[in-house]
């Protein structure tokens, strides 16, 4: 076993322990000592990998989100048609939230205090942007294939991520009065209605512009 593989295994064990402790005790009540004990490593060893509790939590979060993002891409690539790809995207994320409910609830509670104030957040932001660019390309392809009308792909991708985040947040917060029986299908219907409406209005704007240009040419 190489030194690097030992290092990777130890780091992975620490992150697994951190996820378990944070989920069980919450963020405020978790101490680095608790994680070290759970991972069966010395506190000093843990600090070789992570400099603070905030960095430890965000590293565990980033690890999970990368895993979720990879799973979402795999499922989307297996699907045919934009609607099916959207369904796969949302299903993976909702299932992930269900499996990591206690851990992700910390993210909601601590967003302003840890996510925005640590250098590690730059890696997370970069990952979020990469994911959105991937979805935007999927939407652009659907538009080129004539499956949907012309639409600003980046904004549409952002809307899908917003819907996903809303689904997860309502689940974590337990806001059942704002949920429907099949939230994924409802969310897809809402998004597709908006995309179709935008495509129709865009087509109308294009026709109006063409008429104006033609009229101007006749006058000239």
List each language-model region with its residue ranges.
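Amphipathic alpha-helical packing segments from all-alpha helical-bundle domains
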Residues: 66-69, 118-145, 154-158, 182
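Basic, helix-initiating cap at the start of DNA-binding domains
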Residues: 1-25, 29-41, 55
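Hydrophobic alpha-helical connector segments
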Residues: 59, 73-102, 157-160, 200, ...
């Amino acid at each position: 076993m190489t030194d690097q593989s030992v290092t990777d295994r130890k780091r992975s064990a620490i992150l697994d322990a951190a996820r378990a402790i944070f989920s069980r005790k919450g963020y405020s009540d978790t101490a680095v000592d608790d994680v070290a004990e759970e991972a069966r490593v010395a506190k000093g060893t843990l600090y070789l990998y992570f400099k603070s509790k905030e960095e430890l939590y965000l590293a565990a979060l980033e690890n999970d989100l990368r895993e979720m993002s990879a799973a979402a891409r795999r499922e989307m690539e297996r699907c045919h048609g934009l609607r099916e790809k959207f369904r796969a995207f949302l299903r993976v994320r909702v299932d992930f939230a269900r499996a990591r409910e206690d851990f992700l609830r910390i993210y909601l509670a601590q967003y302003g205090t840890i996510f925005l104030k640590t250098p590690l957040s730059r890696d997370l932001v970069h990952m979020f942007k990469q994911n959105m660019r991937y979805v935007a390309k999927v939407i652009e392809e659907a538009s080129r294939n004539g499956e949907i009308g012309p639409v600003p792909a980046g904004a549409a991708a952002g809307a899908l991520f917003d819907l996903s985040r809303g689904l997860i947040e309502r689940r974590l917060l337990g806001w059942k009065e704002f949920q429907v029986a099949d939230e994924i299908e409802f969310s897809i219907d809402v998004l597709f209605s908006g995309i179709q409406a935008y495509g129709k209005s865009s087509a109308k704007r294009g026709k109006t512009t063409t008429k104006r240009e033609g009229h101007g040419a006749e006058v000239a």
